[in-house]
């Protein structure tokens, strides 16, 4: 029994580095593929967005002198590399995948549209959405919110390197405590940085819940999908 029928899984590019300082750790990729395969076996339809921060981040590039638009486009290409890597890892363990791109680049990936994406999900494909929104000045978190809303996901699962949302940065403040559940209004009131404001506002306005959890611990994705109390659940209601 699963808590969700269809989810949008957001993975950070940095998490793909594993213990490395750059690029893609094959062991981390294999762990992700194993968990996602088990999730598919549970009957959950899974759409995925991966960041590109392990390869290139547009904002950082702009700070170093790159034109911001070109920097963001480089970041979009980084998400394509990560998407292809995850697609390859999943197909290697017998999971059907499709990479859809927000910018035309056939045959690397198929051009995204909502109806085709939903059709693929219903056919059992893990559908990986790359290039963010396809526009500069938008983060991959915003791309995740957009895709989650478009594919009519039950929730967005934000897989990170931390195990939820805290009152403060737990790495800097040892007294920080974790929320098991929090509303979007409280996130704004407390000034918590879960995602950028655009991404958070989109989820709030379209009533898309978020579960923030530690994806780097094998098995956690399956626990979230079973409805176990891990991570932090974010929604418009407190109960």
UniProtKB/Swiss-Prot annotation:
Family assignment from sequence similarity: Belongs to the UMP kinase family.
Protein's organism: Porphyromonas gingivalis (strain ATCC BAA-308 / W83)
Source taxon at top rank: Bacteria
Coiled-coil intervals, chain numbering: none
EC number: 2.7.4.22
Pathway membership: Pyrimidine metabolism; CTP biosynthesis via de novo pathway; UDP from UMP (UMPK route): step 1/1
Protein name: Uridylate kinase
Subcellular location: Cytoplasm
InterPro entries registered for this protein in UniProt: AceGlu_kinase-like_sf (IPR036393), Asp/Glu/Uridylate_kinase (IPR001048), Uridylate_kinase (IPR011817), Uridylate_kinase_bac (IPR015963)
Regulation: Inhibited by UTP.
A Gene Ontology biological process term: UDP biosynthetic process
